[in-house]
């Protein structure tokens, strides 16, 4: 039995023996199919191969170690010195190594190598066979004559003539190329095509059949064309001897010829030719009345011939395998094995084919033409009707791995907008209106009416129109009353929220604990990247203080060590309070003039703030629930003895971990990969609550079941403008406000632009004064070159904060910080170096203008260029997000100001810009005043030296020229601006 591998299926093709012709097609029996039987030999071979792989890996590691050891110059020098150092004994009786220097060791090594080479030469016979008996050979000093040449100074050697050699033709005879091509084809099995005339082509290849290498012609009946004479002997007889020249024939009887042998060529060396045709060559076509038929001969009745082309099943699988192997997945992460039978593979292929291309027969041209002539809408209706007619089969197919995605793709692509009546009503209401807002509504409605058939350009246009409408509506929002705090009440709910995922018996074990299942396995993507392990043996003291740039909070993790003394245990229940803030406008959130209570701080019945209490720690739990008693969920049991704490700036990951509880198990992989690869890189460290809520909304779009997921406890620190997401280690610091939002659906409301709230701009565990600190660091470092070099090396985006003031840009240009930045980053990152180049060009333009508003306008116009470059720069430095926010503010401000100017309004912030510029100038002057005394002395000494030197060179009458030259030198020393030079007034010239 022979096995043909087609994709991932094995089909058994029996070597049938046909003694006579038959009109019936031989069916493939079940016993003839390939069966996969595990064998002990295969297991041993697998183990042997795995062992060989490990041995090869070990030898490769040793080889790389030896190469690294030999290439280490320091180690080789130390080995050479120690090799030639002598061992000496000390007074205490110890033995020590008397180390030589490297030069002495090298000379000894060279002497040993030279002596060894001399010994080898002596043993190999490389010496002169001479005898010396006390007599030294001396050169005679007597002149014995020599050769004399007669060449003059004009002599030149005669150039040699090169003989021209004619290239011999490699083609010794006309058929040389043909023989070479056929020789290659017989070895490789490539297809050779002979063009015998206009529109007449003959295809030949060499195949292995019946233990021999035989030429095989491609005959018309193999492609479904039946003619009386398939090959013209008159047009092919010239090539037939050369084709048979490279064939290897064996003794083949007529009874051995069967299906699949059509096109085989035999010459007079075979009995098939001598017994079945009068021609010198025989090409198998089939049988007629038990006798083989030659394809080179004319046949009258073609219906009597039983053609020996491959059976339909083999032809089908040959075409299927050819296309299947051409279209493999681009991702290869495993080694394929045979896990399903041929019948199961055929069912899967047929199900996918009939789902996308439903026909009665794939070989029927009318079935294909029927689908070809359908319009796109008719084709979608055809697929939906076909799927509806075979609903029972689809219920069975969904159990096959991956088939539910096929069904989902078909349903999504064929879905239509069922609310056409609503869309038509919108058309009726907006018809004949030409205002901007009505036209925007019409564009959005057109895209919604088309449903899945909408094009990408139409979707983009609808999104832009929706954004424009949203911005217009936001600008027309009106504020509500001012005395809202007097009547504001936001009591804590007395009832705990019910989470269906924690109440379902199918998701609980026998102890009533939540079973993570596949969710726990995929949660490693969180713990491996954004959590760090807490090692109890090292103590909990280093985890107690949870710092952020604006303050700090103490965790209650130290309470995990429980004292046995009652008095000390009661002391562990006391927290450390921060300054308790009352309810202010920053504690509330409003939309359309109404309170959004889930986005507000919790209060008591009398309207006073509800302050947080001591949160006791637990070891390995996820604590959720903001109202009522908290719920403790065991962390995934992948590492039973490990405790984890979120890394600095990533405490918001506890929110996504709580959402994972409600994610379906089969979608847990997609959820965790989206959080790791898409959400967290965008949020980064210390994101705002606005960004966290937006990220939660994006996740709920793909996983709607997470909307009712319960949140961990969130404390609000108004003093630091920070929100703390409490994990299982609790909080020893008390006195914070408590956020009322208890579910993800309530937290998403922070993502609304219409929501009027200060808390949505709070950092989740982060810092809000980052921009001010970056500006301060830049201003204080302008006149300190060493600090500026550290900034350029570690955090170069801080220099973009100089865009807030033209004066800062000019001073940085004078100190040549931009040039230094280009030198540092031109070999590391071209995008960062490009930022410094553009900053230098912008400063030259700004310095040439004296009007502050025009200078700020130039900076705003360049912001978009900076933003496009910043997108390609590394995002690791801490000031990346701050610089990006500053550029975004300039870009958005420029766009809004342009819109105001177009509508006839005037920007009235010029006074504010001038006041802000004066404050920055005072800061710069203070920085200049704090220059070290050493620098001042250096400048004074330089000025005095220049004055005294030039005073000796000029007489008293050239005092004016001396002063002019001195001012020029003084400008260079004091780094005056090259565009707008100023006269040096720091020095009083002595009278000559």
From Swiss-Prot:
A motif (Involved in virions binding and aphid transmission) lies at residues 617-619. Residues 168-308 form the Peptidase S30 domain. Keywords: Host cell junction, Host-virus interaction, Hydrolase, Inhibition of host innate immune response by virus, Protease, Serine protease, Suppressor of RNA silencing, Transport, Viral immunoevasion, Viral movement protein. GO terms for biological process: proteolysis; symbiont-mediated suppression of host innate immune response; transport of virus in host, cell to cell; viral translational frameshifting. Disulfide bonds: none annotated. The keyword Coiled coil does not apply. GO terms for cellular component: host cell plasmodesma. Signal peptide: none annotated. The active site is at residues 221, 230, 262, 651, 724. A motif (Involved in interaction with stylet and aphid transmission) lies at residues 361-364. The record marks 308-309, 765-766 as: Cleavage. GO terms for molecular function: cysteine-type endopeptidase activity; serine-type peptidase activity. InterPro entries: HC-pro, HC_PRO_CPD_dom, HC_PRO_CPD_sf, Pept_S30_P1_potyvir, Potyvirid-P3. Residues 643-765 form the Peptidase C6 domain. Its EC number is 3.4.21.-, 3.4.22.45. Potyviral RNA is expressed as two polyproteins which undergo post-translational proteolytic processing. Genome polyprotein is processed by NIa-pro, P1 and HC-pro proteinases resulting in the production of at least ten individual proteins. P3N-PIPO is cleaved by P1 and HC-pro proteinases resulting in the production of three individual proteins. The P1 proteinase and the HC-pro cleave only their respective C-termini autocatalytically. It is an enzyme of class 3 (hydrolase). The N-terminus of helper component proteinase is involved in interaction with stylets. The central part is involved in interaction with virions and the C-terminus is involved in cell-to cell movement of the virus. Belongs to the potyviridae P3N-PIPO polyprotein family. This is P3N-PIPO polyprotein. The lineage of its organism: Viruses, Riboviria, Orthornavirae, Pisuviricota, Stelpaviricetes.
